[in-house]
Amino acid sequence: MSNPPFQRQQPSSPLTTPNHHPSNHQHHASRKPSIVELLSSPPPLPNNTIDDEIHQFSLSRNTSISSRTSSFSQQQHGAPHHGSNSHHLSVSGMDWSEIPLSELTESNKLIYINSSYSVQKAFETLVSNNLTSVPVSISSSNENDLSSCLTFDYSDLNTYLLLIMNKINLSELSVSEIGNEHDSTAKKHEIITQTINKAKRGEEVPIEFIIKLHPKNPFIKFTENDTLFKVMETLGNGVHRVAITNLESTKITGILSQRRLIKYMWENARRFPSLDFYLNSTLQDLKIGSSTPIFIYEDQLLIEALYKMFNERVSSLAVIDRTKSLIGNISIVDVKNVSSSKNSHLLFKSVLTFISYNLSQKGIEEGQDQYPIFHVNKQSSLGRVIAKLVATQSHRLWIVESNTRTHQNSISSPVTIEATLNVSANPSSASSSNANTPEGNFGLPGKLIGVVTLTDILGLFATSKGTKTDPQFARNQRRRSSTSTTRSSIDSAISVGDGSARTTNANADSEIFRKSYTAAAKNESAISKD
């Protein structure tokens, strides 16, 4: 079901939406609105107060200095603000494509690390600062020099873990940056083997080693004077994040990710009339998203899911049952939950078991007992899709073909992961008459038929301004950077029919993993909490 178009003039608060059940008015008035109800249309513009002007464009808790200066300067020169439609004067009358990147620069301290950091210390930096990636200075003379840098993220940690577990063949790695440029391939392989053996013994391994093995897109930089249009084109081609530098390009002043950019576009959507058409159109009308989502079956092992994300160069997989019904999602960030020896046994448990474990941990840490599965259908409006992406801080939403009963009850009874776990654990209770069809799995969102990503949406916005984008460009570039393996070896790695052999290997590999992390006892507590 598509959403009604939002009104640009005098936007109404979702909290005051007319109640469709007058007799239950008191009950519904006290009910806590769902995320989707609150964010199905762009948020209203803030009140025209000086305090609101100060906080106008920042995606963080602090705004850029240039934003504050521009706002105060125009107010001091008598620019109208009370009762005016020009709420944010520094960009009054500007289209989103003309916005300078200085308006999106966070004034928070930029966190970065040096290439000499150990993998474990780099991982702790991600966890302690709640980051998904961190810039890495590769300068040998000045560790604060970020003019040339790479990034460390959870995909690197995943590669590191898979290497320790003997799940990656050397032929699958990019070895061009290892050792000296004149070293033979055999010599480079020898260096890799020696380094991995150090990791297995619990010795520290510098992140410079692992980030060179796991190819990424070049770390693209833009100056604060560049416009949002240029960044939209780059991120719309699948690059996950870019650096923003000062005007002289001598210092990185911030990192702009796809996730932060979509949040900015959503929070400021009412200022940009050119977005109206797209936000009110459905995914089907806009023809965005992929019809070939990458997935893992619920009964496959977690280690297989981690390998598949490595091999496919993706950061998330849909989790489905054998009827292709969507159950949930597994992310590359989830690798942090098995980076402790006490949880290593989960690597050889089913993906469904791991999802259940993640839910229990979130319940303990966040005090929540239910988590919705964030999916959409082809008739969902782009506004609804972006609202869910922003609310969940996700990079993608799964497109499903909803069965009639689930779709009719989706508003009053949103599908939760807990409900799907119950259905998966007790398939006979889902439907005694037709348990082998998606329609029989009442309680599941529906059959997985596609995926829509931040890349798709940002690419759509860039295309609307006349440029061409390829959502698969960056991913294909990452895949070309590594040596491909044969299809047969991949298929054998993710097959499901050899459970007994896998159990034997699991015990041996799990012991290797345990030795690697228990040796670094002083860091165990920091890792175990995640």
Swiss-Prot record:
Involved in DNA replication and cell separation. GO terms for biological process: cellular response to glucose starvation; regulation of mitotic metaphase/anaphase transition. Belongs to the SDS23 family. GO terms for molecular function: protein serine/threonine phosphatase inhibitor activity. Residues 22-31 have a biased composition (Basic residues). Residues 1-51, 65-89, 467-509 are annotated as: Disordered. Residues 213-274, 289-347 form the CBS domain. It is found in: Cytoplasm; Nucleus. InterPro entries: AMPK_gamma/SDS23_families (IPR050511), CBS_dom (IPR000644), CBS_dom_sf (IPR046342), Ssd23 (IPR016711). Keywords: CBS domain, Cytoplasm, Nucleus, Repeat. This is Protein SDS23. Residues 1-21 have a biased composition (Polar residues). The gene is SDS23. It comes from the Eukaryota. It holds the Pfam family CBS. GO terms for cellular component: cytoplasm; nucleus. Its main location: cytoplasm.
